[in-house]
Amino acid sequence: SSDLVCEKMNQAVCRYGTEHHIWSMGSTMAMLLFTPESMFACNLGDSRIYFMDGGKLQQISTDHVFGGTAVGKAPLTQYLGLPEELQRLEPSVTEIEHKEGYRYLLCSDGVTDMLSDSEIEAILSQDMEIPEIVNDLLKNALQKGGRDNVTIVLCEVQKLDTVRRMKEWMKNLKDKK
């Protein structure tokens, strides 16, 4: 389950911090989980997951931030590296529809702090290949200031036959081990 995946990632980050004497270490996270029947969006922190449907951008992740602050950015309420003894990790998980041609954007706040949703939507709506769109998002985020790291993953659901081929590929990888 996504909760278990997040728990294991969190433990790994906490363990690394402890082993290397880093007491303030963390990361946001956004991921898509695929099963043969469905797809799930999961996030911690303020990294976002968007969905493009008919040219309209929709945020499907939840920002885990403390209420608005007068100055600067709101602190995160959930993130990888959050010690279990301080607070329980509660990732946001949403089951989402997947159809051929649907596009999903996973990105860090290095994108969303620099570009508005309407700017992101305009870039994603362009009739270009995925690598070109990613480069355009990156270029625009950096031109607007790029004060934080800029992480972008853009994926498009292909024909369901691709899912079958991917399963075979994964099975072959396991068989080789």
Question: Where are these predicted regions, by residue range?
Answer:
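PP2C/PPM-type serine/threonine phosphatase catalytic domain
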Residues: S2-K177
